[in-house]
Amino acid sequence: MSGSGAAGAAAGPAPPAQEEGMTWWYRWLCRLAGVLGAVSCAISGLFNCVTIHPLNIAAGVWMIMNAFILLLCEAPFCCQFVEFANTVAEKVDRLRSWQKAVFYCGMAIVPIVMSLTLTTLLGNAIAFATGVLYGLSALGKKGDAISYARIQQQRQQADEEKLAETFEGEL
C-alpha cells in the first residue's frame, strides 16, 4: 500500500501552482519578489547584527536565515553548494499558494516581533510582499459582474421552479 502511494504521488499531475491558474508571468513575479526579498533580508540582517543589543542580533540572524530559506525555495540555483537545494525547491513548488503565503509572511513577521526597528521593517517588507503575492494568487481570478449576475439569475430561476413544484405538489 505504501509503494502504490509513493508511485501515485511521484506520477501525479502538475504542481498545484499550475492548477490554481497562475500565469507564467505572475509565477516569475513571485519568484523575483522572493529573490529580492532574500537580498533585502540578508543586507538588513547584516546591518542588524552590528549592534550590542541581543534582540537586534537575534532578529538579524533570523533575517539572514530567512534570506537563505527564500533563496533555497525560490531560486535553488543560487544555493548549489547545498546538496538538497533542488529537492527542497521541488517540495516547495508542490505546496499550494496559500501555504507559501502563510510560510513567507510568518517568516517575515518573526524578526519584526523580536526587534521593531526601521531596519527590520524595511528588510522584511519585500519578503512579506512575496507572501502577499502568493496569497493573492491563492484567491484566484474572480469573475466579472456580468457573469456573476447571470449565475445569480440562473440560481434564482432554479429556486423559483423548485418553489412552484412544491406548491403544485401540495395542491
Swiss-Prot record:
It comes from Mus musculus (Mouse). The chain crosses the membrane at residues 32-52, 57-77, 102-122, 125-141. Expressed in neurons in the brain (at protein level). Expressed in neuroblastoma cell lines (at protein level). Expressed in cytotoxic T-lymphoocytes (at protein level). Disruption phenotype: Viable and fertile. Results in lowered susceptibility to skin papillomas induced by 7,12-dimethylbenzanthracene (DMBA) and 12-O-tetradecanoylphorbol-13-acetate (TPA). In cytotoxic T-lymphoocytes, leads to a complete block of early cytotoxic granules (CG) endocytosis at the immuno synapse thereby impairing serial killing of target cells. Does not affect cytotoxic granules exocytosis and global calcium signaling, however increases latency of CG fusion and endosome recycling. Interacts with adaptor protein complex 2 (AP-2). The gene is Cacfd1. InterPro entries: TVP18/Ca-channel_flower. Transmembrane protein which mediates synaptic endocytosis and fitness-based cell culling. In response to different stimulus strengths, controls two major modes of synaptic vesicle (SV) retrieval in hippocampal neurons; Clathrin-mediated endocytosis (CME) in response to mild stimulation and activity-dependent bulk endocytosis (ADBE) in response to strong stimulation. In cytotoxic T-lymphoocytes (CTLs) facilitates calcium-dependent endocytosis of cytotoxic granules (CGs) at the immuno synapse. This is Calcium channel flower homolog. It holds the Pfam family Cg6151-P. It is a multi-pass membrane protein. It comes from the Eukaryota. Induction: Increased expression in stimulated cytotoxic T-lymphoocytes. The lineage of its organism: Eukaryota, Metazoa, Chordata, Craniata, Vertebrata. Belongs to the calcium channel flower family. Residues 1-31, 78-101, 142-171 are cytoplasmic. Keywords: Cell membrane, Membrane, Transmembrane, Transmembrane helix. Its main location: membrane. It is found in: Cell membrane; Vesicle. GO terms for cellular component: plasma membrane; vesicle. In chemically-induced skin papilloma, isoforms 1 and 3 are up-regulated in the papilloma cells and papilloma-surrounding skin, suggesting they might be important for papilloma growth. The keyword Cell membrane applies. Residues 53-56, 123-124 are extracellular.
